[in-house]
UniProtKB/Swiss-Prot annotation:
<comment type="subunit">
    <text>TFIIE is a tetramer of two alpha (tfa1) and two beta (tfa2) subunits. TFIIE associates with RNA polymerase II via the beta subunit.</text>
</comment>
<dbReference type="Pfam" id="PF18121">
    <property type="entry name" value="TFA2_Winged_2"/>
</dbReference>
<dbReference type="InterPro" id="IPR003166">
    <property type="entry name" value="TFIIE_bsu_DNA-bd"/>
</dbReference>
<feature type="DNA-binding region" description="TFIIE beta">
    <location>
        <begin position="67"/>
        <end position="142"/>
    </location>
</feature>
<comment type="similarity">
    <text>Belongs to the TFIIE beta subunit family.</text>
</comment>
<protein>
    <recommendedName>
        <fullName>Transcription initiation factor IIE subunit beta</fullName>
    </recommendedName>
</protein>
<keyword id="KW-0805">Transcription regulation</keyword>
<dbReference type="GO" id="GO:0005634">
    <property type="term" value="C:nucleus"/>
</dbReference>
<dbReference type="GO" id="GO:0005673">
    <property type="term" value="C:transcription factor TFIIE complex"/>
</dbReference>
<keyword id="KW-0804">Transcription</keyword>
<dbReference type="GO" id="GO:0016251">
    <property type="term" value="F:RNA polymerase II general transcription initiation factor activity"/>
</dbReference>
<dbReference type="InterPro" id="IPR016656">
    <property type="entry name" value="TFIIE-bsu"/>
</dbReference>
<keyword id="KW-0238">DNA-binding</keyword>
<feature type="region of interest" description="Disordered">
    <location>
        <begin position="1"/>
        <end position="56"/>
    </location>
</feature>
<feature type="compositionally biased region" description="Low complexity">
    <location>
        <begin position="45"/>
        <end position="55"/>
    </location>
</feature>
<dbReference type="Pfam" id="PF22254">
    <property type="entry name" value="TFA2_E-tether"/>
</dbReference>
<dbReference type="GO" id="GO:0003677">
    <property type="term" value="F:DNA binding"/>
</dbReference>
Length: 285
């Protein structure tokens, strides 16, 4: 025990004799004085004399930058943008325009690159003789007479989209309504707004006179409700368009159900040689 106490006392003496070092404190940046703010606008000399104000100005200049907003990239001066504006201009005017007129509308001179793009565009027709540009619609139809001639040339009575006709015929709706009143075309309108959507050629050879008596009989035929229409058609063996035809059961003659034949066992007995299968009842006393 004495040796342990001696060791403990010697350890305490060594710890007590060791020098004490102070913990280094972090240096606080000196706050700029009011004179530094006043001298910050004097030039480079004042900035060099007061380093605190220089660092403060540098930090503020960094925070003023906004990195989320890209720099001005010149939107509208790109070739494809100018080409789009030129095509829309020719589409609205719907007449041949020279390069000078297009440049006046774009407020920029036509460079050789832009002229080459205009000439090779599939929606623009370039007349080399007159050096004019014309918008090329999806269908080269610009009047009612042209529409009737195009529909008559078709082998089938296929309709046309009015949206496609409006591409090169701005006032197509007004003229189509006049043709409808004359009985030249048939229009399909939207259910909500009644705006024409499709147009067909009206075949006047299909027009026939029907007496009012037959018209009255036709309108007096009762029509079942929409929910019962499919079942009513199915009773007569008809195929409703809203129902799968394979699920419709046609009404036929009352046929008796076929009876299934009993299955006959076609097995062959091979153990007839055994005596146990013989009848010995006659041998009883």
């Amino acid at each position: 025990m004495s040796s342990l106490s001696d060791q403990l006392s010697s350890f305490k003496k060594k710890v007590a004799n060791q020098p004490i070092y102070a913990k280094p404190q972090p240096r606080q940046p000196a706050s700029p004085t009011p004179t530094a703010y006043l001298n910050s606008n004097d030039g480079h000399s004042s900035a060099a004399s007061s380093p605190g104000s220089y660092s403060l100005k540098k930090k503020r200049s960094k925070t003023s930058l906004v990195y989320s907003q890209p720099a001005d990239s010149g939107v509208g001066t790109h070739y494809l943008s100018q080409l789009h504006y030129a095509v829309e201009y020719l589409k609205e005017r719907n007449e041949p325009k020279t390069a000078e007129e297009i440049a006046s509308y774009l407020s920029t001179p036509l460079t050789p690159m832009l002229l080459n793009l205009l000439k090779k565009n599939n929606r623009i027709y370039y007349d080399e003789r007159n050096e004019t540009f014309t918008f090329k619609p999806l269908h080269n139809i610009r009047s009612g007479a042209g529409l009737l001639a195009y529909l008559d040339s078709q082998k089938t009575h296929v309709g046309m989209s009015i949206k496609e006709l409006r591409d090169g015929w701005p006032n197509v709706t007004v003229e189509l309504e006049e043709l409808e009143k004359q009985g030249e075309v048939l229009l399909l309108r939207t259910r909500k707004d009644g705006v024409p959507k499709m147009v067909w050629r009206n075949d006047k050879s299909c027009d026939c006179h029907v007496d009012k008596e037959f018209q009255q009989v036709w309108h007096e035929i009762p029509i079942p409700p929409t929910l019962d229409l499919a079942s009513e058609l199915g009773k007569y063996g008809l195929k409703p368009t809203s129902v799968d035809p394979s699920t419709v059961k046609r009404a036929g003659h009352n046929q008796t159900p076929k009876q299934k034949k009993p299955k006959t066992r076609r097995g062959k007995i091979t153990n007839t040689h055994l005596n146990i299968l013989r009848d010995y009842s006659s041998m009883k006393p």
